[in-house]
Amino acid sequence: MPLSQEEKQRIINEFKTHETDTGSPEVQIALLTHRINELTEHLRVHKKDHHSRRGLLKMVGQRRALLVYLNKISPERYAKLIDRLNIRTVIR
């Protein structure tokens, strides 16, 4: 299920780095994390929904790439974001 406009705006306002920010890595990762969490709950109920499972794996890969990028440009922002989102670190 897609994010409602209000829910998306709430996430953007919570994670934006400046007033007109909509595309920073933090915002993109937060939006992906929300969608991943919703899709994970959907897949717990609908175990045979393989199309959604593939979409979930693509989103996880995209989020991972953004997290690697964020860690490369600013390890402090990366550490703060994974704490706020309560996700595991992807950098070893």
From Swiss-Prot:
SUPFAM superfamilies: S15/NS1 RNA-binding domain. InterPro entries: Ribosomal_uS15, Ribosomal_uS15_bac-type, uS15_NS1_RNA-bd_sf. The keyword Ribosomal protein applies. One of its GO terms (molecular function) is structural constituent of ribosome. Pfam families: Ribosomal_S15 (PF00312). Keywords: Ribonucleoprotein, Ribosomal protein, RNA-binding, rRNA-binding. GO terms for cellular component: cytosolic small ribosomal subunit. It comes from the Bacteria. The keyword Ribosomal protein applies. NCBIfam families: S15_bact. One of the primary rRNA binding proteins, it binds directly to 16S rRNA where it helps nucleate assembly of the platform of the 30S subunit by binding and bridging several RNA helices of the 16S rRNA. Forms an intersubunit bridge (bridge B4) with the 23S rRNA of the 50S subunit in the ribosome. Belongs to the universal ribosomal protein uS15 family. This is Small ribosomal subunit protein uS15. It comes from Symbiobacterium thermophilum (strain DSM 24528 / JCM 14929 / IAM 14863 / T).
